[in-house]
């Protein structure tokens, strides 16, 4: 199917669901109850067989958005960068830092390449939604516990953006920055307090090499991390890790600009442009880290 037909089909579908359907419902509700009841008894019969076609249209548009819009903005940053929608960070790589607890997730929408002599991979890590069985219990206390469990899992489990950078220099020790929103208290290393009070208020720092940690966490780098966190929105929690020869950056809660659901605003070129801006912002972290590593030789 041609690009023009895909866009036309998606636009027609969104017009019906966004404008026509609500107007029709309003008219019906203003009329007699019998008409309302009759129509809504018929709607499931009409709609149900067409759900696969709706899903197919949405999937076609998502594929078009990724293969055209996203691929274009990634190539515009650097023609040597690679965008692979079906690839992403592995579970072993993700849990290496020990910042987040283990949950089922899948990695996708990987952007990789070399920037300033540093190999990097940027991808989405999307958690698999859990199901909670009520076991038929009507006990209000058990219901409260289930709700608490859902809220706790939503708060603790990671779902967002991950950046992995491979530097030319091995780190002697391990240094981890955990956003204070992360409740994990089993992170390895001794807790370190830096001179930057504002940074200490936002992050907990753990390291087994305090000298190296202070070189890596330069004032410029700490400022860059704060700017990234602010740029992704106040709801995002940011954590990071230096280990072996790699730097890991975790943005939990970052908006997934590669996907949309049935009732979301349709993805557009502006969303792809936002991806480009976010990538450029993250790459500036590499520039700052290279400066820190040049000092720490």
Predicted segments with their positions:
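Hydrophobic alpha-helical transmembrane segments
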Residues: 26-42
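Conserved oxyanion/phosphate-binding beta-strand-loop segments in alpha/beta enzyme cores
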Residues: 80
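Canonical alpha-helical transmembrane segments of integral membrane proteins
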Residues: 11-30
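Cytosolic juxtamembrane N-terminal segments of multi-pass membrane proteins
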Residues: 1-10, 77
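Charged, low-complexity intrinsically disordered regions
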Residues: 71-77, 85-141, 149-297
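Hydrophobic or amphipathic, alpha-helical segments that drive membrane association/targeting
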Residues: 10, 36, 44-47
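Transmembrane-cytosolic junction motif
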Residues: 5, 44-69
């Amino acid at each position: 199917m041609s690009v023009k037909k895909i866009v036309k089909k998606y636009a027609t579908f969104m017009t019906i669901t966004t404008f026509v359907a609500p107007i029709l419902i309003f008219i019906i509700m203003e009329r007699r109850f019998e008409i309302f009841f009759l129509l809504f008894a018929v709607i499931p019969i009409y709609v149900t067989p067409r759900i696969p076609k709706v899903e197919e249209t949405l999937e076609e548009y998502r594929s078009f958005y990724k293969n055209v819009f996203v691929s274009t903005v990634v190539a515009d940053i650097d023609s040597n960068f690679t965008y692979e929608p079906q690839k992403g960070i592995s579970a072993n790589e993700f849990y290496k830092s020990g910042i987040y607890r283990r949950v089922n997730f899948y990695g996708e929408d990987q952007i990789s390449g070399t920037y300033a002599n540093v190999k990097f991979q940027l991808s989405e890590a999307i958690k698999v939604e859990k199901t909670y069985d009520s076991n038929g219990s009507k006990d209000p206390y058990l219901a409260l516990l289930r709700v608490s469990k859902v809220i706790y899992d939503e708060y603790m489990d990671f779902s967002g953006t991950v950046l992995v950078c491979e530097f030319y220099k091995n780190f002697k020790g391990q240094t981890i920055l955990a956003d204070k929103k992360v409740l994990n208290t089993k992170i390895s290393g001794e807790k370190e307090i830096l001179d930057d009070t504002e940074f200490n208020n936002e992050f907990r720092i753990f390291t087994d090499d305090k000298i190296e940690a202070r070189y890596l966490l330069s004032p410029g780098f700490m400022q860059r991390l704060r700017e990234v966190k602010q740029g992704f929105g106040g709801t995002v929690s940011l954590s990071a890790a230096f280990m072996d020869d790699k730097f890991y950056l975790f943005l939990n809660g970052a908006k997934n600009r590669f996907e949309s659901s049935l009732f979301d605003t349709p993805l557009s070129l502006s969303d792809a442009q936002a991806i480009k801006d976010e990538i450029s912002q993250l790459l500036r972290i590499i520039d700052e880290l290279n400066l820190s590593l040049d000092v720490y030789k």
